[in-house]
Every structure is written in structure tokens, then in C-alpha cells.
From Swiss-Prot:
Pathway: Carbohydrate degradation; L-fucose degradation; L-lactaldehyde and glycerone phosphate from L-fucose: step 1/3
Localization in the cell: Cytoplasm
Active site: E337 (proton acceptor), D361 (proton acceptor)
Top enzyme category: isomerase
Reactions catalysed: L-fucose = L-fuculose
Gene, per the UniProt record: fucI
Protein name (record): L-fucose isomerase
Record keywords: Carbohydrate metabolism, Cytoplasm, Fucose metabolism, Isomerase, Manganese, Metal-binding
Amino acid sequence: MKKISLPKIGIRPVIDGRRMGVRESLEEQTMNMAKATAALITEKMHHACGAQVECVIADTCIAGMAESAACEEKFSSQNVGVTITVTPCWCYGSETIDMDPMRPKAIWGFNGTERPGAVYLAAALAAHSQKGIPAFSIYGHDVQDADDTSIPADVEEKLLRFARAGLAVASMKGKSYLSVGGVSMGIAGSIVDHNFFESWLGMKVQAVDMTELRRRIDQKIYYEAELEMALAWADKNFRYGEDQNASQYKRNEAQNRAVLKESLLMAMCIRDMMQGNKTLADKGLVEESLGYNAIAAGFQGQRHWTDQYPNGDTAEALLNSSFDWNGVREPFVVATENDSLNGVAMLFGHQLTGTAQIFADVRTYWSPEAVERVTGQALSGLAEHGIIHLINSGSAALDGACKQRDSEGKPTMKPHWEISQQEADACLAATEWCPAIHEYFRGGGYSSRFLTEGGVPFTMTRVNIIKGLGPVLQIAEGWSVELPKAMHDQLDARTNSTWPTTCFAPRLTGKGPFTDVYSVMANWGANHGVLTIGHVGADFITLAAMLRIPVCMHNVEEAKIYRPSAWAAHGMDIEGQDYRACQNYGPLYKR
């Protein structure tokens, strides 16, 4: 089957169409703007899969309807999913704009004095607003000379932020969310909302009963040689942690081996269900070899599976990580307990950064007073105002141990194309695999246990659905915190010391939900959240605006907030603007 091509970014150089001197004098400058924009994006951006982003430039500058149509024909044939219009001069507004209502679009109007690029930008944006097709405005802060071909830092920041978010939109469109199982323990996020996926994300939902996973395992619908490779890899790399189960629930060596084998098979089969596996076709299993075109998935697990079979912790942790027995590779997005809304937050984070995501329970707010009462020690540094304990039974990406290093030698989580095998090995070495607690998981399993290094910038996010309003996005930028060992051990033991842990300190603003750490916890909309590496809340805000998902909570600096220009016409308070604009325009893929 032909592989689906990656979306490209289309660059549209627009120009003043008056011949006999005007157009001719602008052709080179205008096309050079397009080439410079394409070069910037190609140099600095990757798809989430690691491939370099490709740009497609219109064959000619666009002065009117005919050339605009020719450009659109070219873009349609090359899977262009995002467009950037560039110009240094006056052009004819509504005659030259990109009219595709579902494709993210931006306009860069050159800030120069010789020709009025700013005037075209304003005229074109007015046309976009009047026609109900929002576009992003890019206009440099400082005047440039006409022969200055450089891209100023503020323009570059907006171009790249727009391109990252726009490619995320284009990459999700037409894909599916694979729901393996149904509702887990009454968790609202696992009540998978087809309308949300279809209308806001342009995705489908593929619902598959967990018996399909059972069938694939029992009937050996997998690549058997790969299973042996996975087992050998686990034997080499897995360190096993404490077994906290009562003696009557402890498993013997043979039983533990069977649990490990099934856990690895679950990872293989869920992966194959998501993306397909051509080796299955060689076994005559053509239908199963295709997969479900899933860009994200969720596994119900509890309790209809886990009361009898090994839990999904090992499978989910390995799939969500940037490496496994096949080496370093793109992480998958698999939500535990089939929490599809947390899965979408994971998907957003992965598409924006190319990194693995940490899925966690937003478990406990620890106040400074409570910590001192319990441990006899005081919180300090980033943790001085309290922490949020993020911990789940083991589905967090192993990258979350933060044993990878940035260019300054600081702990981080890298895009998978930058991760060395040594860094992957370090993450594995920092992880223990603890037998699942019987009272939670009667069918057994292994939970990964690691502790996230401290001082690492993170952005915590969550999508929620509100009846009568639709989806909303929550964002909290902050840092991981590493507590003194004795303090950590006491706090960890009160929940479960066999699970992966991240202590998170959000950045406080002194206002609203970020008045204090308690307020962040109290305003969080669900029991789960996602950690994405870096302070990337501004990228999430731009992406949400493209999809028409209002942001109900964030601590991003106002200067970094970047939304379509039409949002400014929806009132004077920027967060109210967001709600009114999203309601006015409705979901991107209206149904």
C-alpha cells in the first residue's frame, strides 16, 4: 500500500501586478522573501517523525486571481497543508489571499518604507476577517532596508511558531485515534467523543474491543522473530525492582517470564494495530498488516483486562518512549486507561516538539506545611511554594527520567532524532521494573519506576470537554523538582513507591489559577495531565487557536501569545477574545 505523504508548507509570494515598471522592480525581492522563508523552515524544522519539513514555493509571484489559482493547483498536487504568504509591497488584497478555509495560513508583510508591505498585510487581513477565514499576521518590529534579505528575530519566532502549530494541524488531519477498549473506571476522558475528533481535529475514531488484542496474542498475529529480539533486549536492559505484594500473590520465575512475554507482545500488537506491519502480510494476514492509520491510541486496561491479564504499563511505557529493542525511534502516543483527551494533549505535545510525553495522574498537592509536618524537612528552591506530585502506575515515557543531555549538559528530553543510543541506555538504566500491585492489577504486569531529574522546564497540559462549550485546553508551565532523597522516599511511599514520579512546581503569577500551587491543582480539570519538555505553552496556544479550542487556564507571558489577527476584533481582554472567537468561527472542521 502506498505510504501517505507528509504535509508540506506552501510559500505564496504576492506582488503588485502593475506592469511597465512596478511589478518588474519587485519580482526578485518578492521571490527572495519566499526563498528565505522556505530556507529558514527547512533548516530549523522537522516533522514529528524526524523528517525534514519540505516547502513548496509558487512557480510565479501572485498578482491576482489567475496566478492565485495556478498556485493553488500546484499546492493541491503536492499535499500542502499550511501556507505562508509573503510580500514586500502593496498587492491586491482579496484577489491574492489563500481562501482554503481549513488550511492554517499566515501573512508576512515586510516592514520597509520603499513599498507598503504593511498596507497589503492590513488589507489582506481585513479581507480574511470579513470572509471568516482567520489568518496570522507577521510584521517585523523594526524597519528594514529594501535590500535587506535577513529575517529579523521577532519575525523568525512567529514564522516558526506558526509553522510548528500549522504542521501539527495538517499532520493530524485524516488520521485516527485508536480506542482499544471502552470506558475505564468511569473516567470521562475514556468516553471517547467522536464529534470532538471529527470536528476539531479532522480525525476519525477507530473503536476496537480488547478481545482483538487477545486474538492477536493468542493466534500469533505478530512477527515471532521480533518477540525473541524483544525478550533478549529486555533480558539485557531491564532492572527489576521491589515486589511489594503479599507472599501469596508473588509469582514464581516462570510466571514472571510469562508476564514479561505477554507485556512485550501487547506493545508489539498495539503498535501493529496503530501503524500496521508489512511482515504480517508475508504470513497471509493482509488485513491485519494494514493497521488503523492511528496517530494516537488509548488502552482501557482497567479493569476488564487487568483483572485477568497483565496490565498495560510496560507496553504503554515502551510505546510512549523514544526507544525499544529496535533502537531509537519516534515515540508513539498511547494513553493509559484510554483517556483520549489526555491522549490528545500528548499528541499536541509530540507534534509540536517531536519528543516523548509524560502521562501522569495529577495526584497530590503537597503544601510546604504538609511536607514539613510529614518529613520534618522544609521545601526550598523551586519547590518552596509547594509541589504537585505527578505519578501513575507506569505508562510514562522512560525519557521522563531526563537522562538525556542538552548542548549545555543539562538534563532534558530530546526530539528522538537527536537522541544517542547511550542516552537511551541511560534512561533504561535509571528505570526499575516492579511487579504490579495485586490489589490494583490481579493479572499482574510490571510498572516502570523512575524519578525525573530536577530543574527541568516542563509544560503541563490537558484537554477537557465542557457540555455546551466544547473542548478547552489547560496549560501550566513550570519545572521538575528533585527533593532530598529522604524527603522524596517518605512522600513517595505514601502513594506507591513502585511507580514513576515527577514532582512539578508550576510558575506562579499571583493571579487567578496561578495565585499559588494549590490553585493550580484546584483548577485542574481532570485527574490526568501531560508533561511536555520545555516552556512551550505559547506553541500550544497558537495550535489551539488554529483548531478553535479556547484556552481556559495558562501562565504564558502575554507577549508570547500568538493568535489569528481577527481575535483582536472580539473584545479587549485577550482571553475573552479567545473564547468569543472560537465560538464565532466554530470548530475548524465544522460538522
